[in-house]
Amino acid sequence: MLERIKDSFTHSIQTKIDASEALPESIAKAAEMMVHCLLGGNKILACGNGGSAGDAQHFSAELLNRFEVERPPLPAIALTTDTSTITAIANDYSYDEIFSKQILALGQPGDILLAISTSGHSGNVIKAIEAALSRDMTIVALTGKDGGPMAGLLSINDVEIRVPSNSTARIQEVHLLAIHCLCDNIDRTLFPQDEQQ
């Protein structure tokens, strides 16, 4: 058991090392897009399932409240939190539409969708991307494995941050780090006077 726990740490560290080589450019581009979005008076919508829903809420909370520096709140909405809306859509239409219908109502041209799926195969996240694109939104996709069908929906205007791993747990761990990197870059670009070491 102890060896298995140590292996989990080792595998997590190695995945982060691999990601540190593969992901910085994508994360930097995504952060730049988010800064441009926010400066333009737009907002960021976020969605995912299970642990990825938690990540969507985590990202939204960091923007609405604060990350590591004091600053004004920034507009972000996690589409995973309104149980009345989610269950109404799932019951009346389908689970695949729980995010897309919200995006069609709330999304505006210039907004960004942060779409999170460890596999890239989540049907409702795929529908969310399609809805966002129909609203002239830009996509930042956090994925893993081979990117799945989500990767195929993205254009040169979008960004995929694909974790180089096939382990769902390891992908989720790097997704959280990527989210923290996005928040840090957003804060330090928008509020450089608040920079701390």
UniProtKB/Swiss-Prot annotation:
Q: Which positions are annotated as binding substrate?
A: 49-51, 62, 91-92, 117-119, 122, 172
Q: Which GO terms describe its cellular component?
A: cytoplasm
Can you tell me which residues bind Zn(2+)? 58, 62, 172, 180
One MF term in the entry's GO annotations: carbohydrate derivative binding
Superkingdom as given in the UniProt entry: Bacteria
Q: Which UniProt keywords apply?
A: Carbohydrate metabolism, Cytoplasm, Isomerase, Metal-binding, Zinc
Pathway listed for it is: Carbohydrate biosynthesis; D-glycero-D-manno-heptose 7-phosphate biosynthesis; D-glycero-alpha-D-manno-heptose 7-phosphate and D-glycero-beta-D-manno-heptose 7-phosphate from sedoheptulose 7-phosphate: step 1/1
Stored Gene3D superfamilies: Glucose-6-phosphate isomerase like protein, domain 1 (3.40.50.10490)
| Coiled-coil residue windows | none
Quote the InterPro entries the UniProt record gives: GmhA/DiaA, Phosphoheptose_Isoase, SIS_dom, SIS_dom_sf, SIS_GmhA/DiaA_subfam
The SIS domain extends over 34-196
What PROSITE patterns does the entry give? SIS (PS51464)
Q: What class of enzyme is it?
A: isomerase
Please list the cofactors this protein needs.
Zn(2+)
Q: How is the cofactor bound?
A: Binds 1 zinc ion per subunit.
Give compartment(s): Cytoplasm
Q: Which GO terms describe its biological process?
A: carbohydrate metabolic process; D-glycero-D-manno-heptose 7-phosphate biosynthetic process
UniProt catalytic activity:
2 D-sedoheptulose 7-phosphate = D-glycero-alpha-D-manno-heptose 7-phosphate + D-glycero-beta-D-manno-heptose 7-phosphate
Q: What is its EC number?
A: 5.3.1.28
**UniProt subunit comment:** Homotetramer.
Describe its function.
Catalyzes the isomerization of sedoheptulose 7-phosphate in D-glycero-D-manno-heptose 7-phosphate.
Q: In which family does this protein belong, per the annotation?
A: Belongs to the SIS family. GmhA subfamily.
- Additional remarks: The reaction produces a racemic mixture of D-glycero-alpha-D-manno-heptose 7-phosphate and D-glycero-beta-D-manno-heptose 7-phosphate.
Name the UniProt record assigns to this protein: Phosphoheptose isomerase
Q: Name the source organism.
A: Shewanella sediminis (strain HAW-EB3)
